[in-house]
Amino acid sequence: MEAAAGGRGCFQPHPGLQKTLEQFHLSSMSSLGGPAAFSARWAQEAYKKESAKEAGAAAVPAPVPAATEPPPVLHLPAIQPPPPVLPGPFFMPSDRSTERCETVLEGETISCFVVGGEKRLCLPQILNSVLRDFSLQQINAVCDELHIYCSRCTADQLEILKVMGILPFSAPSCGLITKTDAERLCNALLYGGAYPPPCKKELAASLALGLELSERSVRVYHECFGKCKGLLVPELYSSPSAACIQCLDCRLMYPPHKFVVHSHKALENRTCHWGFDSANWRAYILLSQDYTGKEEQARLGRCLDDVKEKFDYGNKYKRRVPRVSSEPPASIRPKTDDTSSQSPAPSEKDKPSSWLRTLAGSSNKSLGCVHPRQRLSAFRPWSPAVSASEKELSPHLPALIRDSFYSYKSFETAVAPNVALAPPAQQKVVSSPPCAAAVSRAPEPLATCTQPRKRKLTVDTPGAPETLAPVAAPEEDKDSEAEVEVESREEFTSSLSSLSSPSFTSSSSAKDLGSPGARALPSAVPDAAAPADAPSGLEAELEHLRQALEGGLDTKEAKEKFLHEVVKMRVKQEEKLSAALQAKRSLHQELEFLRVAKKEKLREATEAKRNLRKEIERLRAENEKKMKEANESRLRLKRELEQARQARVCDKGCEAGRLRAKYSAQIEDLQVKLQHAEADREQLRADLLREREAREHLEKVVKELQEQLWPRARPEAAGSEGAAELEP
């Protein structure tokens, strides 16, 4: 215990691990996942404190034992040397791709860059087109809720966006958002996860129950962004954007590419999503697990495959080919010739056809390619059992490649389109129309099953049982309808695909003539005529095989075994030829891709050069206009300055005369005013004289009046004085 405690006390985290954690902590601050939400430093400190306490408790001395016992020896733990410092983790340089491409988001074309396999969309273009009806506050709130973080583009990417006219030349920076986060953001803002307004429970329950119980609906689900279950109605899928899936939570109808983003449960906001594209909904929508082990699982699976194949113009979706054993069962042994007229048992009908179907369906394993439909969904957990089973089956299954690798025939050689393959135990003759007449002899089904669907060698089979005649007629009708559908689909696909493999018709026709079926059919029917366009070597080989089968091999089992060996040899030759053709097609496709990429880059460079030339012309015109205006203003100011200088010189010469004239005018005015004042003074003097004369005359008159009145006044005054004296 003490040793363990001591060893625990001296433990230190691995230097390489500690360095990795520190680098992750520093780099996560600027990563796309936002700021680091967890730091390992507090955990290390807590662990150090706990280990220090345990080491202190272990260092306490033990009690002294009895004298009979020897003193205990304290065994200290050996000091372990520090582990060697390992080199740090290998960090790949960040992908700074500057190759601009375009993608479609909610019907709008958005420019983007492919960085690390994920498309980074131009955020300003999304805000101005798809989310133009929402404010920045709403968008930021949804981004915080969904934990969506955007990155900034590099200087080269910003320059490309400016040159292409997507951003103005004055833009200082630009944000980039991944295609997955853009799908989540647009779905949350445009459609939201709100439930519809409540309605009557009885009506809603009856409608939902009626749709669920209907045989025309299929229960499906997806595991993207929190999972969602729904009901698929194949009849409603009439266009690529038709609403044909009903959500079991909100009872609303959605198109397939909208249903894979729709969810009402946990939105997986703290999950790092990568590589999601709603256009790949065919890989995300899966059949409900409620059908596991039920009878209708195969039928509903075929129905779902039919829906996924509709409107698949890019021919990206392929049916799942069932994985069965490549070796024929040990119990498959044809009956003797005397019982050939009797109708074989149902088990004997199924076993040869299943083995031949296995031989035909093994083309998927020829070049190590994995069918897109066989790959697990990007949002489902990976199971190692699947890869183990694939590895076990792959070395035993022979390869049988037909026509072009990029066509549907490479995955469905012996199966008509729109006809799903059932499990091996439940296979019937009807599921494979070309194998309908394959129950009488072993060579005949091999010839009909492995024969390509475009060119068929129509021969008479005299040894065929009469009991199969009513079954073969409707099967031939179905086969003809399937041929028409195959040819129309192939023409439409070839018209849409610009990177189709070269010389498709020639290679397919050449392989049709060299297929095992074409070789085995004359061996079963000796009276049949060889095709007119077959080469002489093929006829000789067929004749040699016919003689070997008829002469050297007596029993049917020996013939079947020999034919099986021949088919295996032929399959190996076909595999080598197919590998060579595939390599040639790959080289052609790569060359075409390089040519298209070079043409696109040249076009972009030419367009950028044209835009730069236009920008230079515009700047030159603006500069010329500004220079012209500057010259005109300079000349105008020069003229004004010259006029001012001349006016100043003229003022200096005429200043004295101007002052003299001014003063003379003032003197004249003053003289005039003085003359007026003199005239006024003379007039006033005359007026004063007249007034004096008038006053003197008046005084004279007054005196005369006084003299006339004066004598009367004296007696009256004397009388008044005497009366006054008498009164006292």
UniProtKB/Swiss-Prot annotation:
Q: Which InterPro entries match?
A: c-SKI_SMAD4-bd_dom (IPR014890), DHD_Ski (IPR047315), DNA-bd_dom_put_sf (IPR009061), SAND-like_dom_sf (IPR010919), SKI/SNO/DAC (IPR003380), Ski_DNA-bd_sf (IPR037000), Tscrpt_reg_SKI_SnoN (IPR023216)
Q: Which GO terms describe its molecular function?
A: DNA-binding transcription factor activity, RNA polymerase II-specific; DNA-binding transcription factor binding; DNA-binding transcription repressor activity, RNA polymerase II-specific; histone deacetylase inhibitor activity; identical protein binding; protein domain specific binding; protein kinase binding; RNA polymerase II cis-regulatory region sequence-specific DNA binding
* GO cellular component term of the entry, any: PML body
Under CDD domains, the record lists: DHD_Ski
List the signal peptide residues.
none
**Listed Acidic residues bias regions:** 474-485
Subunit note: Interacts with SMAD2, SMAD3 and SMAD4. Interacts with HIPK2. Part of a complex with HIPK2 and SMAD1/2/3. Interacts with PRDM16 and SMAD3; the interaction with PRDM16 promotes the recruitment SMAD3-HDAC1 complex on the promoter of TGF-beta target genes.
Which disease shows up in the entry for this protein?
Shprintzen-Goldberg craniosynostosis syndrome: A very rare syndrome characterized by a marfanoid habitus, craniosynostosis, characteristic dysmorphic facial features, skeletal and cardiovascular abnormalities, intellectual disability, developmental delay and learning disabilities.
Q: What does this protein do?
A: May play a role in terminal differentiation of skeletal muscle cells but not in the determination of cells to the myogenic lineage. Functions as a repressor of TGF-beta signaling.
Task: Identify this protein by name.
Answer: Ski oncogene
Q: Organism, per UniProt?
A: Homo sapiens (Human)
